[in-house]
Amino acid sequence: MGQMAIDESRCDDPRKLRDLLGKAASLASDYSLRSVVVGIAGREGDLLLPEVIDFFESMLRVDDSIFRMTRERAVLVLADVDRARAEEIVERLMNGFRERFSPAVDPEVDFGFFEVTPDEGDVSVKHVLLALFAPEDTY
């Protein structure tokens, strides 16, 4: 029961995700700046994934953010990048995690990408989460 309370306290308020997506949509519509929302999903019960998310958060730029959904899922918002650049950033972060911590087992993490562009019509939480965590949109 104590573990459950710890896990729940590490999850963010759902309003934060709505605000982060609103900020990305505003950057796109007001300034024609693309942003990429990255879904981070691990296996249920994976003890290493929270460490990966902590590492990602420690390496982010000031304009980037992480939203923790559950112990095994998070959303990363990268401002002023396109999808190709976001994929490079995620790869660099994963390599940095591996180099810094040399885990005995490589973390099993799936990433989904949603690019917020100036002409993107729907940046609602529901639409973005479906795009991020649908099995066919991960690699």
Where are these regions (language model features)?
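Charge-rich, low-complexity segments
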Residues: 1-6, 20-23
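Catalytic-site/binding-pocket detector for metal-dependent nucleotidyl cyclases
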Residues: 6-16, 28-29, 45, 63-68
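Active-site-proximal alpha-helical element of nucleotidyl cyclase-like catalytic domains
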Residues: 15-20, 43-63
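Active-site-proximal structural segments of metal-dependent nucleotidyl cyclase/transferase enzymes
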Residues: 17-42
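Conserved helix-loop-beta segment at the catalytic/binding core of cyclic-nucleotide signaling proteins
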Residues: 25-29, 53-81, 99-104
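Catalytic cores and conserved motifs of cyclic dinucleotide signaling enzymes
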Residues: 46-53, 84-88, 116-139
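An amphipathic, aromatic/His-enriched active-site/gating alpha helix that lines ligand/cofactor pockets
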Residues: 87-104
